Amino acid sequence: MTLSRRAFGRNLLATALLMQGFGLSRAFAADPQRAIVYNCPAEWAGWGSMLPIIKAETGIEVPMDNKNSGQSVSQIIAEANNPVADAAYLGISFAINAKNQGLVENYKGEGWQKVPAGLKDPDGAWVSIHAGTVGLMVNTEALDGLPVPKGWKDLLDPKYEGMVGFLDPSSAFVGYACSVAVNHALGGTLDDFGPALDYFKKLNELSPIVPKQTAYARCLSGEIPILFDYDFDAYRAKYADGAPIEFVIPVEGTIQVPYVMTLVKNAPHAENGRRVIDFVLSEKGQKHWAENFLRPVVGDLEKLAPEAAKKFLPASEYERAGSVDYARMAEVQRAFSEAYLQAMK
């Protein structure tokens, strides 16, 4: 097949951008009207539509960034002597650990006081901006006639071999959050991950797909028929993208998890980072999250986005979603990651 000049040019540009890697972020960081926010992929949690709103409302351009939480923290550590990022969007356990490593600046800005105490660091090191519930995102057409699974244990049936996917628990926060959810549902605690490790050992025998980056598009395409993910992704897929997706809150139980933002220590454009955090916690920012099926941390879902709220599963289903001690979840994350990697050998 012969490429047109235009197609060749596109491929050449894509390759150049890929090879530039994190250097591209450094180029963006040089612009005073930009803020670098690590971990804001277009396909994840409404960021694709939020970034243009931030630009329109604040004048600050935030380029898309495809890192996951673990990769973001690793990059911040690597750049500690010459920071590139101004802020980061992280799973809560990664943010707690980032604070403990001295990687972030305290900031109590507009909207911070309105966030419930359990969803923000008392010193201002991080603040939750929205939350989601862990469950199963199921592409019903890709099941090839198999029944929609109702719980975690159903996926250990060999008939689902090769159909299940989850993000790498040792790197991506959603992978770790799903592991905590499985463990919680199957009788484990944050001091005993035995149930989750046993579960993943059994699931590993059925050829699961374990990517490191968001796998939203791969579930929509049917490549991953059953994905451990959040409710907000499943609802967006079904109601915004028109995909044959159902969200399942496992019968054994699950957890609800907040995502947070933090200001990077010695950020090159710290004021821009602060303004971005202020905006996502504003009424307009929280309304946007709610309209994208995320649980807001300031205001009520039903009031901010009544039409979106109607599309959630019934409240009785969400009664199976509990919470955990997020500080303890952060403390045991490294030990779990090491145990998980050992178990998968």
Enumerate the predicted regions with their spans:
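Periplasmic-binding protein-like
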Residues: 114, 197-202, 208-209, 241-265, ...
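Extracellular/periplasmic bilobal clamshell ligand-binding domains
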Residues: 307-345
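Mature extracytoplasmic/periplasmic domains
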Residues: 264-321
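Extracytoplasmic ligand-binding site segments that recognize negatively charged/polar headgroups
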Residues: 40-48, 84-223
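A ligand-binding cleft/hinge motif common to bilobed small-molecule-binding domains
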Residues: 92-99, 220, 225-244
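Early extracytoplasmic/lumenal segment of secretory-pathway proteins
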Residues: 30-96
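N-terminal secretory signal peptides and thylakoid transit peptides that target proteins
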Residues: 1-19
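A bilobed periplasmic-binding-protein/Venus flytrap-type ligand-binding module shared by bacterial periplasmic
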Residues: 135-142, 180-185, 257-270, 288-289
